[in-house]
Amino acid sequence: PKRRTKGQIAIEAGLAPLADQLLDNPTLDPDITANDFINPEKGIEDRKAALDGAKFILMERFAEDAKLLAKLRGMLQRNGHIESKVITGKEKDGAKYQDYFEHSEALSHIPSHRALAMLRARNEGIISLTINPNPSLEDGNAECVRIIADHYKLDVLASPWLKQVAQWTWKIKLALPLENEFLAKIREVAEQGAIDVFAKNLNDLLMAAPAGAKTI
Protein backbone atom coordinates (compact mmCIF):
# COMPACT_ATOMS: atom_id res chain seq x y z
CA PRO A 1 0.00 0.00 0.00
CA LYS A 2 1.12 3.54 -0.74
CA ARG A 3 2.51 5.32 2.30
CA ARG A 4 0.28 8.13 3.52
CA THR A 5 1.76 11.61 3.51
CA LYS A 6 1.85 13.85 6.58
CA GLY A 7 -0.75 16.02 4.91
CA GLN A 8 -3.11 13.07 4.39
CA ILE A 9 -2.68 12.01 8.01
CA ALA A 10 -3.49 15.58 9.12
CA ILE A 11 -6.63 15.62 6.94
CA GLU A 12 -7.74 12.32 8.50
CA ALA A 13 -7.23 13.92 11.92
CA GLY A 14 -9.71 16.65 10.97
CA LEU A 15 -7.28 19.51 10.34
CA ALA A 16 -8.31 20.45 6.78
CA PRO A 17 -10.81 23.07 8.06
CA LEU A 18 -8.01 24.71 10.07
CA ALA A 19 -5.77 24.85 6.99
CA ASP A 20 -8.66 26.30 4.95
CA GLN A 21 -9.51 28.94 7.54
CA LEU A 22 -5.92 30.13 7.85
CA LEU A 23 -5.44 30.32 4.07
CA ASP A 24 -8.82 31.92 3.33
CA ASN A 25 -8.31 34.51 6.09
CA PRO A 26 -4.56 35.25 6.07
CA THR A 27 -4.78 37.80 8.91
CA LEU A 28 -6.21 35.30 11.42
CA ASP A 29 -4.05 34.56 14.44
CA PRO A 30 -2.96 30.93 13.89
CA ASP A 31 -2.44 30.18 17.58
CA ILE A 32 -5.92 31.35 18.58
CA THR A 33 -7.56 29.64 15.59
CA ALA A 34 -5.75 26.36 16.32
CA ASN A 35 -7.21 26.16 19.84
CA ASP A 36 -10.49 24.85 18.42
CA PHE A 37 -8.73 21.92 16.77
CA ILE A 38 -6.92 20.40 19.74
CA ASN A 39 -8.10 16.78 19.93
CA PRO A 40 -5.96 14.37 21.96
CA GLU A 41 -8.06 11.41 20.78
CA LYS A 42 -6.80 12.04 17.26
CA GLY A 43 -3.24 12.75 18.34
CA ILE A 44 -3.57 16.54 18.28
CA GLU A 45 -2.30 17.24 21.77
CA ASP A 46 -1.76 20.99 21.51
CA ARG A 47 -1.80 24.04 19.22
CA LYS A 48 1.62 23.20 17.80
CA ALA A 49 0.43 19.77 16.67
CA ALA A 50 -2.65 21.34 15.07
CA LEU A 51 -0.59 23.97 13.24
CA ASP A 52 1.98 21.40 12.13
CA GLY A 53 -0.83 19.37 10.58
CA ALA A 54 -2.26 22.44 8.84
CA LYS A 55 1.23 23.27 7.58
CA PHE A 56 1.65 19.83 6.00
CA ILE A 57 -1.79 20.08 4.36
CA LEU A 58 -1.02 23.49 2.83
CA MET A 59 2.50 22.56 1.74
CA GLU A 60 1.21 19.54 -0.16
CA ARG A 61 -1.63 21.58 -1.64
CA PHE A 62 0.74 24.34 -2.78
CA ALA A 63 3.23 21.85 -4.23
CA GLU A 64 0.51 20.23 -6.37
CA ASP A 65 -0.99 23.49 -7.68
CA ALA A 66 -0.52 23.31 -11.47
CA LYS A 67 -0.98 27.06 -11.99
CA LEU A 68 1.59 27.87 -9.32
CA LEU A 69 4.06 25.37 -10.78
CA ALA A 70 3.62 26.96 -14.21
CA LYS A 71 4.51 30.38 -12.76
CA LEU A 72 7.61 28.99 -11.03
CA ARG A 73 8.77 27.11 -14.14
CA GLY A 74 8.27 30.24 -16.24
CA MET A 75 10.34 32.35 -13.85
CA LEU A 76 13.13 29.76 -13.74
CA GLN A 77 13.16 29.56 -17.54
CA ARG A 78 13.40 33.36 -17.85
CA ASN A 79 15.80 34.18 -15.02
CA GLY A 80 17.41 30.96 -13.81
CA HIS A 81 21.11 30.19 -14.12
CA ILE A 82 22.88 26.85 -13.89
CA GLU A 83 25.80 27.25 -11.49
CA SER A 84 28.75 24.93 -11.06
CA LYS A 85 31.30 24.74 -8.26
CA VAL A 86 34.29 22.45 -7.91
CA ILE A 87 34.09 19.86 -5.13
CA THR A 88 36.86 20.47 -2.61
CA GLY A 89 39.86 18.25 -3.30
CA LYS A 90 38.86 17.46 -6.88
CA GLU A 91 40.76 20.31 -8.52
CA LYS A 92 43.63 18.10 -9.70
CA ASP A 93 41.53 15.13 -10.87
CA GLY A 94 39.19 17.40 -12.76
CA ALA A 95 41.73 19.77 -14.29
CA LYS A 96 40.20 19.33 -17.75
CA TYR A 97 36.97 20.79 -16.36
CA GLN A 98 38.58 23.83 -14.77
CA ASP A 99 36.43 26.19 -16.86
CA TYR A 100 33.49 24.97 -14.77
CA PHE A 101 35.11 25.11 -11.30
CA GLU A 102 33.07 28.27 -10.70
CA HIS A 103 30.71 29.02 -13.55
CA SER A 104 27.25 30.50 -14.02
CA GLU A 105 25.20 30.58 -17.20
CA ALA A 106 21.60 31.40 -18.12
CA LEU A 107 19.41 28.33 -18.53
CA SER A 108 17.88 29.85 -21.63
CA HIS A 109 21.19 30.39 -23.45
CA ILE A 110 23.59 27.61 -22.48
CA PRO A 111 25.10 25.90 -25.56
CA SER A 112 24.72 22.12 -25.87
CA HIS A 113 28.44 21.35 -25.70
CA ARG A 114 28.88 23.36 -22.50
CA ALA A 115 25.82 21.84 -20.84
CA LEU A 116 27.02 18.32 -21.65
CA ALA A 117 30.53 19.08 -20.32
CA MET A 118 29.10 20.38 -17.04
CA LEU A 119 26.82 17.37 -16.66
CA ARG A 120 29.74 15.05 -17.40
CA ALA A 121 31.89 16.79 -14.78
CA ARG A 122 29.12 16.42 -12.22
CA ASN A 123 28.66 12.72 -13.04
CA GLU A 124 32.40 12.21 -12.53
CA GLY A 125 32.17 13.82 -9.09
CA ILE A 126 34.25 16.87 -10.01
CA ILE A 127 31.68 19.65 -9.66
CA SER A 128 28.29 20.24 -8.10
CA LEU A 129 25.47 21.75 -10.14
CA THR A 130 22.64 23.89 -8.82
CA ILE A 131 19.96 26.10 -10.31
CA ASN A 132 19.95 29.69 -9.03
CA PRO A 133 16.42 31.02 -9.63
CA ASN A 134 17.59 34.61 -10.05
CA PRO A 135 21.29 35.49 -9.66
CA SER A 136 20.55 39.20 -10.01
CA LEU A 137 19.09 39.06 -6.50
CA GLU A 138 21.03 38.56 -3.28
CA ASP A 139 18.81 35.56 -2.54
CA GLY A 140 17.37 34.04 -5.71
CA ASN A 141 15.18 31.65 -3.72
CA ALA A 142 13.33 34.62 -2.21
CA GLU A 143 11.85 35.30 -5.65
CA CYS A 144 10.29 31.83 -5.70
CA VAL A 145 8.87 32.29 -2.20
CA ARG A 146 7.41 35.65 -3.32
CA ILE A 147 5.70 33.97 -6.29
CA ILE A 148 4.13 31.40 -3.96
CA ALA A 149 2.98 34.13 -1.54
CA ASP A 150 1.58 36.30 -4.36
CA HIS A 151 -0.24 33.32 -5.89
CA TYR A 152 -2.16 32.85 -2.65
CA LYS A 153 -2.52 36.60 -2.00
CA LEU A 154 -0.40 36.55 1.14
CA ASP A 155 0.32 40.27 1.45
CA VAL A 156 2.11 42.21 4.20
CA LEU A 157 -0.84 41.68 6.54
CA ALA A 158 -0.72 37.89 6.28
CA SER A 159 0.40 36.05 9.40
CA PRO A 160 4.13 35.26 9.71
CA TRP A 161 3.09 31.60 10.03
CA LEU A 162 1.52 31.60 6.55
CA LYS A 163 4.55 33.33 5.05
CA GLN A 164 6.70 30.65 6.63
CA VAL A 165 4.51 27.97 5.03
CA ALA A 166 5.33 29.55 1.65
CA GLN A 167 9.05 29.39 2.52
CA TRP A 168 8.81 25.76 3.68
CA THR A 169 6.92 24.82 0.52
CA TRP A 170 9.71 26.15 -1.70
CA LYS A 171 12.59 24.85 0.40
CA ILE A 172 11.22 21.39 1.26
CA LYS A 173 8.72 20.52 -1.48
CA LEU A 174 9.63 22.35 -4.67
CA ALA A 175 13.24 23.58 -4.91
CA LEU A 176 14.95 20.21 -5.41
CA PRO A 177 12.30 18.58 -7.65
CA LEU A 178 12.22 21.63 -9.95
CA GLU A 179 16.03 21.80 -10.00
CA ASN A 180 16.21 18.12 -10.99
CA GLU A 181 13.49 18.65 -13.59
CA PHE A 182 15.42 21.52 -15.21
CA LEU A 183 18.74 19.65 -15.13
CA ALA A 184 17.06 16.67 -16.81
CA LYS A 185 15.55 19.00 -19.42
CA ILE A 186 18.94 20.62 -20.04
CA ARG A 187 20.45 17.17 -20.60
CA GLU A 188 17.65 16.18 -22.97
CA VAL A 189 17.91 19.39 -25.01
CA ALA A 190 21.73 19.35 -25.00
CA GLU A 191 21.90 15.73 -26.15
CA GLN A 192 19.38 16.43 -28.90
CA GLY A 193 21.39 19.50 -29.89
CA ALA A 194 24.58 17.44 -30.03
CA ILE A 195 22.81 14.79 -32.13
CA ASP A 196 21.50 17.47 -34.50
CA VAL A 197 24.99 18.97 -34.89
CA PHE A 198 26.50 15.52 -35.49
CA ALA A 199 23.79 14.68 -38.03
CA LYS A 200 24.36 17.97 -39.86
CA ASN A 201 28.14 17.45 -39.93
CA LEU A 202 27.66 13.89 -41.18
CA ASN A 203 25.23 15.07 -43.84
CA ASP A 204 27.66 17.79 -44.95
CA LEU A 205 30.40 15.17 -45.18
CA LEU A 206 28.23 12.82 -47.23
CA MET A 207 27.23 15.63 -49.57
CA ALA A 208 30.82 16.76 -50.08
CA ALA A 209 32.80 15.80 -53.14
CA PRO A 210 34.83 12.57 -52.78
CA ALA A 211 38.37 13.08 -51.52
CA GLY A 212 40.69 14.13 -54.30
CA ALA A 213 37.86 14.86 -56.72
CA LYS A 214 37.50 18.28 -58.21
CA THR A 215 34.12 19.91 -58.52
CA ILE A 216 33.43 21.57 -61.86
Residue ranges of predicted features:
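Duplex nucleic acid-engaging cores and interfaces of nucleic-acid transaction enzymes
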Residues: 1-215
